[in-house]
Amino acid sequence: MNIAANIADDPETGDIDDGAGPALFADAPRSVSFNKLRKRLLRQVRQAFDDFDMLKGQKRWLVGLSGGKDSYGLLALLLDLKWRGLLSVELIACNLDQGQPNFPKHVLPDYLTKIGVRHRIEYRDTYSIVKEKVPEGATYCSLCSRLRRGNLYRIAREEGCDALVLGHHREDILETFFMNFFHGGRLASMPAKLLNDEGDLMVLRPLAYAAEDDLARFAAAMQFPIIPCDLCGSQDGLQRNAMKDMLADIERRMPGRKDTMLRALSHVNPSHLLDPKLFDFSSLGVTDPS
């Protein structure tokens, strides 16, 4: 498995003609650099599909759309793959309006209607619950995320979907790994494919191999109508920000280390760790020389 940024040319993805693609690509840049970026992201999504068998038994997906660069990018790439005949799954875009102050309610439905994507926008005032439960000065993100996830599961079931598809990328996975490493005392990250606790829905992250910088460039070029993620006034947790800064510093000092770290997560050697639940150390013994 090669998860470096420059994956070898994929003949099935093919060349991209200027202006080619689904409706949302109508105003996309006509440049070699953008086409290379687009093709790289498409290959990385397809590689995640293959590596984690994401398409097995899948007919309909609920695509979580927050209004941020990552979820917009995810939706665009999935639509691009459908346009190319490389993805047969039906897509439903979904945004959960959580009652955050100043949330621009018109942005997502207007955009999704314009590009002709089936969608569902639902209002659930989880913001008031978070305000009530979280102490003053603490970050809302963790509880807000859990409440959002529960509602998205419900909506996925109501829409007859097989999976909830989310826009987490390479950096999200690495940051989660180091948060668990430094603060949780365990080796765990954010899986690319997960069966929910009830066992009736998959959670898929097709952008697992995609770099955040690439997604930011893609979003800027596509001119997605971005909705800021800090409308509630809360900021990302200090722990995650510290991990983000640490990873950025490592990448500046030693370019390419993020790809190396991500590759390490798929090359685990239990016999060289310290968990007897993963490896039977009691079975080891010195060979009798006689």
Swiss-Prot record:
Positions of [4Fe-4S] cluster binding: 141, 144, 232
Catalytic activity: cytidine(32) in tRNA + S-sulfanyl-L-cysteinyl-[cysteine desulfurase] + AH2 + ATP = 2-thiocytidine(32) in tRNA + L-cysteinyl-[cysteine desulfurase] + A + AMP + diphosphate + H(+)
Protein localization: Cytoplasm
GO BP field: tRNA thio-modification
EC number(s) reported in the record: 2.8.1.-
Top-level class of the enzyme under EC nomenclature: transferase
Keywords: 4Fe-4S, ATP-binding, Cytoplasm, Iron, Iron-sulfur, Magnesium, Metal-binding, Nucleotide-binding, RNA-binding, Transferase, tRNA processing, tRNA-binding
Cofactor names: Mg(2+); [4Fe-4S] cluster
Taxonomic superkingdom: Bacteria
Gene Ontology cellular component terms for the protein in this record: cytoplasm
Free-text remark on how the cofactor is bound: Binds 1 [4Fe-4S] cluster per subunit. The cluster is chelated by three Cys residues, the fourth Fe has a free coordination site that may bind a sulfur atom transferred from the persulfide of IscS.
Motif annotated as PP-loop motif, chain positions: 66-71
Family matches, as Pfam families: ATP_bind_3
Pathway in which this enzyme or protein is active: tRNA modification
Gene Ontology MF term list: 4 iron, 4 sulfur cluster binding; ATP binding; magnesium ion binding; sulfurtransferase activity; tRNA binding
Function: Catalyzes the ATP-dependent 2-thiolation of cytidine in position 32 of tRNA, to form 2-thiocytidine (s(2)C32). The sulfur atoms are provided by the cysteine/cysteine desulfurase (IscS) system.
Family: Belongs to the TtcA family.
Subunit structure: Homodimer.
Miscellaneous: The thiolation reaction likely consists of two steps: a first activation step by ATP to form an adenylated intermediate of the target base of tRNA, and a second nucleophilic substitution step of the sulfur (S) atom supplied by the hydrosulfide attached to the Fe-S cluster.
Entry protein name: tRNA-cytidine(32) 2-sulfurtransferase
Originating species: Rhizobium etli (strain ATCC 51251 / DSM 11541 / JCM 21823 / NBRC 15573 / CFN 42)
